[in-house]
From Swiss-Prot:
Signal peptide residue numbers: 1-20
Keywords for this protein: Disulfide bond, Glycoprotein, Hormone, Secreted, Signal
GO cellular component: cytoplasm; extracellular space
Gene coding for it: tshb
SUPFAM superfamilies per the UniProt record, alphabetical: Cystine-knot cytokines
Record has Nuclease as a keyword: no
Organism listed in the record: Oncorhynchus mykiss (Rainbow trout)
Cystine crosslinks: 22-72, 36-87, 39-127, 47-103, 51-105, 108-115
Entry protein name: Thyrotropin subunit beta
Presence of the UniProt keyword Glycoprotein in the record: yes
Length: 147
């Protein structure tokens, strides 16, 4: 009995490394420009999940080899551009946003990715103007243009 419990625990420990914990996840961006008439909800995917990290509390003795800081970040990303509806002629109606195609656990590349989490205000308000939805599939409306 004890052996089967130990084997089950070992299998769970080994299997947890094979289960993807960092995956593309559906997310809605809200873009509102002062000069345009509408707030736009854009459905996309972002990288979200948990990655193994370790930070020793004895860095002075152990050195950097015990410091492992990884986050869930883009492996492959595609950028798409939408035309924001209700913008006047003098305003640029184009908005480009990332779509996560695949993700991995690794260090964040600050040259190309946003690596810090921005806290929301918590009031639940996303838009102050009327809302329009932009869909990720080009056939659903005429506002999206793939790059």
């Amino acid at each position: 009995m004890e052996l089967s419990v130990a084997m089950y625990g070992l299998l769970c420990l080994l299997f947890s490394q094979a289960v993807p914990m960092c995956v593309p996840t559906d997310y809605t961006l809200y873009e509102e420009r002062r000069e345009c008439d509408f707030c736009v909800a854009i459905n996309t995917t972002i990288c979200m999940g948990f990655c193994y990290s370790r930070d020793s509390n004895m860095k002075e003795l152990a050195g950097p080899r015990f410091l492992i800081q990884r986050g869930c970040t883009y492996d492959q990303v595609e950028y798409r551009t939408v035309i924001l509806p209700g913008c006047p002629l003098h305003a640029n109606p184009l908005f480009t946003y990332p779509v996560a195609l695949s993700c991995h656990c690794g260090t964040c590349n600050t040259d190309s990715d946003e690596c810090a989490h921005k806290a929301s205000s918590g009031d639940g308000a996303r838009c102050s103007k009327p809302l329009r939805h932009i869909y990720p599939y080009p056939g659903l409306n005429s506002y999206i243009h793939p790059n």
